């Protein structure tokens, strides 16, 4: 199923998901710097593997996907399947509602 078929995302619920499942490796604030994973500020409309100052896997650079709702929705289901060879060890979010919520949060928090 694609993002267009996903339930409406709730940014508040998405923030909770981010804090419990993503924040140990990612920051969203402008200028917050990188952790184990890259800072996600300015994520929407950016090509994978291009955040300045972060050392990406060749897989992330070579995928050359532009991050937006549809690509994030597919990626967050199973990151290692979407970008084989990615350094991101996160297993993914199986529930469409959780992915929609996280994307709604990221759209606000990374802008």
UniProtKB/Swiss-Prot annotation:
Domain of life: Eukaryota
The UniProt record lists the keyword Mitochondrion: yes
Modifications the protein undergoes after translation, according to the UniProt entry: Binds 1 heme c group covalently per subunit.
Keyword Heme annotated: yes
Residues holding heme c: 22, 25-26, 88
Subcellular localization(s) per the UniProt record: Mitochondrion intermembrane space
Keyword entries, A-Z: Electron transport, Heme, Iron, Metal-binding, Mitochondrion, Respiratory chain, Transport
Coiled-coil segments on the chain, per record: none
GO BP annotations listed: mitochondrial electron transport, cytochrome c to oxygen; mitochondrial electron transport, ubiquinol to cytochrome c
GO MF annotation: an example: electron transfer activity
GO cellular component, one term: mitochondrial intermembrane space
Similarity comment: Belongs to the cytochrome c family.
Biological function: Electron carrier protein. The oxidized form of the cytochrome c heme group can accept an electron from the heme group of the cytochrome c1 subunit of cytochrome reductase. Cytochrome c then transfers this electron to the cytochrome oxidase complex, the final protein carrier in the mitochondrial electron-transport chain.
Protein name: Cytochrome c
Taxonomic source organism: Zea mays (Maize)
Native organism taxonomy: Eukaryota, Viridiplantae, Streptophyta, Embryophyta, Tracheophyta
């Amino acid at each position: 199923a694609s993002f267009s078929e996903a339930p409406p995302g709730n940014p508040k619920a998405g923030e909770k998901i981010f804090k419990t499942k993503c924040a140990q490796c990612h920051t969203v604030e402008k200028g917050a710097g990188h952790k184990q994973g890259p800072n996600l500020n300015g994520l929407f409309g950016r090509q994978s593997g291009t955040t300045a100052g972060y050392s990406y896997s060749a897989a992330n650079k070579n995928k050359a996907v532009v991050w937006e709702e549809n690509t994030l929705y597919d990626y967050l289901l199973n990151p290692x399947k979407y970008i084989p060879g990615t350094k991101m060890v996160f297993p993914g979010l199986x529930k469409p509602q959780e992915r929609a919520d996280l994307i709604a949060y990221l759209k606000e928090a990374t802008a």
